[in-house]
Amino acid sequence: MNSETLPAELPATLTIASRESRLAMWQAEHVRDALRKLYPACDVKILGMTTRGDQILDRTLSKVGGKGLFVKELESALADGRADLAVHSLKDVPMVLPEGFALAAVMSREDPRDAFVSNDYASLDALPAGAVVGTSSLRREAMLRARHPRLDVRPLRGNLDTRLAKLDRGDYAAIILAAAGLKRLGLAARIRALLDVDDSLPAAGQGALGIEIAARRADVAAWLAPLHDHASALAVEAERAVSRALGGSCEVPLAAHAVWRGGELHLTGSVSTTDGARVLAAHAHARAATAADALALGRRVSDALERQGARAIVDALVAASAQAQKGGA
């Protein structure tokens, strides 16, 4: 980028809000370094924050309020001016942002697949019957129960290092993690196998970094524009459109994955019951040049899932989750 294309009125300082986990800080530092390279005269800082999602580790997200627990404190910092932007793993961002906030940039995507991690076994198929497998999401839990019913699937909370420590001390025979996080932290060697998307369809936005801002900050949006990867953003928008249309959240084993092939965006969506007894899937593809195109593609897939009965599954799971939260209040 040359001086003629730089946004006007660059600030003296830009502050990035981030969770304080090692992975979250890596992501914030990745954005910070990119901004420093673009704007060397600007002092880019990171404001580390602890979110409620980081603090509540004894219950699954579906029972304590969902993905918004990881972003609310960061959004408060955006709203009151303590931070100019917030960096998120997009799979942790609610499908509908609160009023007054916007997703300003999606960076080039890392590997969206799930990873099988174990100290003793090479793959899910190699695990003996009754082996304990840990996962942090209902989506992965449903996948495991559907494809590997002989395994003992149990919840696994905590940041990436905590989850690996629980595996290493013998609490689990294996755990399922996002490949992107392991690769970003230089832990790719811990991956024993990458799960094919046909076997474990990723969460919407998995592997992508999103940068959120206060919607009123058009200036920040302009400064972030060079970081935006259009192809990744369209894929993520299509995926999130599936989940958004169905009311997807942590209460629902819902997956969506889009990939570019031959100039077209190919999108697959899936909804299942938590026990894996019923799995619905739909696929569509189209040429997508704009966010509206990606949204339309997502709606085609969500409509196809609804015709198969996805709405009844989603509504039942959301109602059950609400009852569980009420009972635990």
Curated annotation (Swiss-Prot):
The lineage of its organism: Bacteria, Pseudomonadati, Pseudomonadota, Betaproteobacteria, Burkholderiales. The keyword Nucleotide-binding does not apply. It comes from Burkholderia pseudomallei (strain 668). CDD domains: PBP2_EcHMBS_like (cd13646). GO terms for cellular component: cytoplasm. Tetrapolymerization of the monopyrrole PBG into the hydroxymethylbilane pre-uroporphyrinogen in several discrete steps. PROSITE patterns: PORPHOBILINOGEN_DEAM (PS00533). It holds the Pfam family Porphobil_deam. This is Porphobilinogen deaminase. Its cofactor is dipyrromethane. Binds 1 dipyrromethane group covalently. GO terms for molecular function: hydroxymethylbilane synthase activity. Keywords: Porphyrin biosynthesis, Transferase. The modification S-(dipyrrolylmethanemethyl)cysteine is found at residue 250. HAMAP family: Porphobil_deam (MF_00260). One of its GO terms (biological process) is protoporphyrinogen IX biosynthetic process. Its EC number is 2.5.1.61. The keyword Transcription regulation does not apply. The porphobilinogen subunits are added to the dipyrromethane group. Belongs to the HMBS family. Monomer. InterPro entries: HemC (IPR000860), Porphobilin_deaminase_cofac_BS (IPR022419), Porphobilin_deaminase_N (IPR022417), Porphobilinogen_deaminase_C (IPR022418), Porphobilinogen_deaminase_C_sf (IPR036803). It catalyses: 4 porphobilinogen + H2O = hydroxymethylbilane + 4 NH4(+). Pathway: Porphyrin-containing compound metabolism; protoporphyrin-IX biosynthesis; coproporphyrinogen-III from 5-aminolevulinate: step 2/4. The gene is hemC.
